[in-house]
Curated annotation (Swiss-Prot):
The lineage of its organism: Bacteria, Pseudomonadati, Pseudomonadota, Gammaproteobacteria, Pseudomonadales. It is found in: Cytoplasm. It catalyses: octanoyl-[ACP] + L-lysyl-[protein] = N(6)-octanoyl-L-lysyl-[protein] + holo-[ACP] + H(+). The keyword Transferase applies. Pfam families: LplA-B_cat. Pathway: Protein modification; protein lipoylation via endogenous pathway; protein N(6)-(lipoyl)lysine from octanoyl-[acyl-carrier-protein]: step 1/2. This is Octanoyltransferase.
């Protein structure tokens, strides 16, 4: 079991500065650096992963498109979606990539179960699904044994922009969100429950809230 996992709650932040901060953190961290998870919402943005194809951006319209270095294909971020960036020393944790993905999926499934929503993962399509509709997306990058990027959970948001793309490269993939499955949801409470599930499933002994910026 690892020691302490630090969380930063960043509120609503533009995507690109957070992306650059993740890269800097990953490049500059030492073998003794504490693992961190950054909890954030983004203004409307499409992000294209390394496997993304231009034809999966159907009608982006006025929503910006950002090319990223995470795994996966195109997805949408917007207010009311809880994003968590996992800045972990995966080598120190002793996880392979597949195990890390599975542990993140199990944390999300556990969170949803706490709202009486039964969800599952698919071995051939990372993420978490409810009755075939996707509620959470995953996209990671591992560099020198350290992870960055992470997960996006649809909580209480406008899902319409997902219709402008083929989410994760799948034409017609249905998307859902926690509000539509469990009624009115407080995002603060979702964050608290998500923190607990990530600490549990990533096998940390405790958690702490980190203060200060990410510049």
């Amino acid at each position: 079991m690892s020691a302490c996992l630090g969380f930063r709650e960043l509120g609503l932040q533009p995507y690109e500065p957070v992306l650059e901060a993740m890269r800097r953190f990953t490049e500059q961290r030492s073998p003794d650096s504490q693992d961190e998870i950054w909890l954030v919402e983004h203004p409307a943005v499409f992000t294209q992963g390394q496997a993304g194809k231009a034809e999966h951006l159907l009608v982006p319209g006025d929503i910006p498109v950002v090319q990223t270095d995470r795994g996966g294909q195109v997805t949408y971020h917007g207010p009311g979606q809880q994003v968590a960036y996992l800045l972990l020393d995966v080598r120190r944790l002793g996880f392979g990539v597949r195990e890390l993905v599975s542990r993140i999926e199990q944390a999300l499934i556990g969170l949803l179960a706490s709202y009486d929503v039964q969800a599952s993962a698919k071995p051939d399509a990372p993420g978490v699904y409810v009755d075939g509709a996707k509620i959470a997306s995953l996209g990671l990058r591992i560099r020198n044994g350290r992870s960055f990027h992470g997960l996006a959970l649809n909580v209480d948001m406008d899902l319409a922009p997902f219709r402008r793309i083929n989410p994760c490269g799948y034409a017609g993939l249905a998307m859902t969100q926690l509000r539509d499955l469990a009624g009115p949801i407080e995002l603060d409470e979702v964050r608290t429950r998500l923190r607990g599930q990530l600490v549990k499933h990533l096998d940390y002994a405790e958690q702490t809230t980190l203060t200060g910026g990410i510049d």
